[in-house]
Each structure stands twice: as structure tokens, then as C-alpha cells.
């Protein structure tokens, strides 16, 4: 009898623990420590197939990341806010929703519209709101930002926009030593490498070719205004080499006295102390002006794209600059995506944003399934441009 009482005393807490865990038997929310205790007590593996992502490894749960990108805005605050709201980046009041992890803008906020000051101020506001919510805003300098810091081109600047600054001189000062110019120097880059998974590090972590054969080595996207040309000599290390050149050239341009508007005055050009690499940055095959991915024949670009993706450690390159007024353009199976659709009222193109939804799901102790859904978001419809699934084996940190 005493032995029976002892056996009953030992089994009671174990059975109670089993009853506690029963509701979680097929849920990813099983408390891992309790599950481990339960399994150890019985000293055997479960006879059923558990939900992966919570049972076989602490923290090995499904990982998700949502990225939204928008192209050229050209001085149109109303259309910009409409686009960001329909993509879930901001609410009706223009504030960060927290529904996306990263928002990327590929440059050309300035010119062709009157809302330059409002737009740059709004981008800085969203940058702060995103950071406070655990998100991020990545901003890029387009060729129009560079044209203005080199010397204002009166071909693209409306007189009504100049009035919002007060005068041409005040506008030039705002873009050099004023709040907009300071934000360019602090918060804007020429290009970005955005990882789809945090195991690759934060945005703009350089691609390491030594890791080329690891499962997630190229699980990243490149963003730039114009394009990353195959002939461009400063692609690597990516993206730090290009961004260092951009930072150096911007500093030199902002430090010189602003030249008078061109035309009617002569084109001022780059500073005398600009290096050959800085000149190449601003050349036709540089990342600010290159249009080949958008305009060259399909067979030609598809034959070259993998070389650039390999060097930059990315799966897709996303850019603005070359507008298609009806749609976001996807080429070579979604490896090339051009997101400038002429959003501003000066162009009258379609309102659009690009959404990238990435999911990494554990399928076994070392097995994983990636899914990347790339969607063109329009005002009244959505179009899936790519829906890629990939399975692999490997040790991936989910923390």
C-alpha cells in the first residue's frame, strides 16, 4: 500500500503537466521549457510529428519581414501620402503605422512640384517614427537631388516651388547647409543592400563573397535610383564603396559656394577636386543615371543581371528613374524591378508602391522554407510580380 501511494504521488504532477500542455499540442506557442521538462520526464521522443518552429528548437519560429518601396515623388505631397497610405506605411494622418518593417524611397523627391520642403520634412518625421516603433526608413539620393546640389537646373524647378523657399538663394542654402542638405548628408545614401533576414545583419551590411555558398548569402535586395550597371567599376564592396563615394562627393559639393542657376548660366560641373571615381559615380553608367536595365532588350539584360546580383550579394535589384506611367516593370523573372510610375501630378502616372513579403519557416531541425512574394500595389488593385519558394538545409540563427 505505501508503494502504491508513492507511485500515485509521483504520477500526479506529471499527469497534471500533461493536461496543462494538451491545449498547446498543435500550437507554435508551446512553452519550450515546459515541453523540455515533459519530454525529459518520459525519456522518449513524441510519437506524433510536432509543430516545427517551437518544439525542436527554442526560438526557431517563423520569421517574417515586410518591405515597401516607392519611386520618384517629385514634389507631390498629396500623391506621396496617398501611395504610402494604400501600401500600409502610414495612416490617414500621415503617421507610421508599424505594419511594415522597412520603407525604402529611391530618390527624386525634389523638382517638378511645389512640396519639396514638406516631403523632406515628412521623410525625416517618418524616419523618427519608424525607429521608435522598431522599423526603418531608407532614403536615397536621385539624379535630381544631385543636379540641384551641383547647381540648380531651372529646367525642372517651378517658379511656384522657389516661392516656397523664399528665393533661389534661400533654396540653394537649404540644400547645402540648411535642414534639407544636412538630412541628405546624414540620412541619404546612393544605394542600399537590404537583407531579407536579420541573420545577414542590418541594412547596408556589406556582402561578403566568402559566404557565397551559405544558404542565405544572397537573401537581400539592392535599391538605387538609376541602376547598377555591369560596366560600373565600383560595385564592390557593396554597398559601402558606392556610398563612400557618394558621401565624399556630396561633402565637396555642399562645401562650395552655390553657383547661379543653369541655364542661363553655364553648367558648373563637379568640383575641381572631384576624383575620377567620383566623376564615374555621376557618369551615364553610374548608379544615378544608368537606364540600361529599363530600356535595353530583354534578352540582353537577362544575360547580364546574374553577374551583378552575384557581385552585390542580392536576388533582385530595384530602382526608379525611368518611368513607366502605367505599371511597375518586372523583368527577368523579377530580378529587375523598376518602380518609377510617374506618381507626381506633373507626370500624371499611376499611383504605385512595391511590397515585398518575406517568410522563413522551419520545416525540420535543419530544414527551412523561404517564400518571397513581390507585389505591385496600385490604388484599386494588386498584381503579384513574383512568388518564389525555396527549400534548403542549414543552421540559421532566428534571433
Predicted feature residues:
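Feature recognizes metal-dependent phosphohydrolase scaffolds
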Residues: 1-399
Amino acid at each position: 500500500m505505501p508503494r502504491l501511494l508513492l507511485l500515485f504521488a509521483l504520477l500526479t504532477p506529471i499527469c497534471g503537466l500533461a493536461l496543462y500542455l494538451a491545449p498547446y499540442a498543435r500550437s507554435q506557442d508551446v512553452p519550450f521549457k515546459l515541453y523540455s521538462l515533459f519530454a525529459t520526464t518520459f525519456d522518449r521522443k513524441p510519437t506524433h510529428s510536432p509543430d516545427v518552429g517551437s518544439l525542436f528548437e527554442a526560438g526557431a519560429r517563423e520569421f517574417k519581414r515586410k518591405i515597401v518601396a516607392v519611386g520618384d515623388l517629385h514634389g507631390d505631397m498629396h500623391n506621396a501620402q496617398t501611395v504610402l497610405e494604400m501600401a500600409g506605411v502610414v495612416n490617414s494622418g500621415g503617421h507610421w503605422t508599424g505594419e511594415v518593417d522597412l520603407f525604402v524611397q529611391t530618390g527624386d523627391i525634389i523638382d517638378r512640384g511645389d512640396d519639396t520642403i514638406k516631403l523632406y520634412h515628412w521623410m525625416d518625421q517618418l524616419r523618427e517614427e519608424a525607429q521608435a516603433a522598431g522599423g526603418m526608413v531608407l532614403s536615397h539620393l536621385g539624379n535630381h537631388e544631385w543636379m540641384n546640389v551641383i547647381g540648380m537646373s531651372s529646367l525642372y524647378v517651378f517658379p511656384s516651388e522657389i516661392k516656397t523657399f523664399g528665393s533661389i538663394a534661400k533654396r540653394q542654402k537649404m540644400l547645402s547647409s540648411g535642414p534639407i542638405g544636412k538630412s541628405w548628408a546624414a540620412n541619404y545614401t546612393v544605394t542600399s543592400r537590404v537583407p531579407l533576414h536579420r541573420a545577414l545583419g542590418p541594412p547596408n551590411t556589406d556582402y561578403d563573397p566568402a559566404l557565397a555558398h551559405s544558404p542565405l548569402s544572397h537573401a537581400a535586395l539592392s535599391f538605387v535610383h538609376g541602376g547598377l550597371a555591369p560596366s560600373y567599376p565600383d560595385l564592390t564592396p557593396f554597398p559601402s564603396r558606392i556610398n563612400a563615394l557618394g558621401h565624399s562627393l556630396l561633402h565637396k559639393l555642399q562645401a562650395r559656394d552655390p553657383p547661379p542657376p543653369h541655364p542661363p548660366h553655364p553648367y558648373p560641373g563637379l568640383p575641381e577636386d572631384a576624383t575620377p571615381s567620383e566623376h564615374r559615380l555621376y557618369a551615364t553608367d553610374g548608379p544615378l543615371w544608368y537606364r540600361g536595365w529599363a530600356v535595353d532588350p530583354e534578352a540582353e539584360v537577362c544575360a547580364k543581371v546574374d553577374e551583378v546580383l552575384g557581385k552585390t550579394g542580392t536576388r533582385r535589384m530595384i530602382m526608379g528613374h525611368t518611368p513607366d506611367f502605367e505599371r511597375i516593370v518586372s523583368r527577368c523573372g523579377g530580378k529587375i524591378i523598376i518602380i518609377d510610375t510617374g506618381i507626381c501630378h506633373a507626370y500624371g502616372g499611376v499611383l504605385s508602391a512595391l511590397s515585398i513579403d518575406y517568410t522563413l519557416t522551419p520545416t525540420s531541425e535543419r530544414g527551412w522554407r523561404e517564400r518571397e512574394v513581390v507585389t505591385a500595389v496600385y490604388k484599386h488593385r494588386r498584381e503579384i510580380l513574383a512568388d518564389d519558394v525555396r527549400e534548403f538545409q542549414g543552421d540559421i540563427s532566428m534571433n
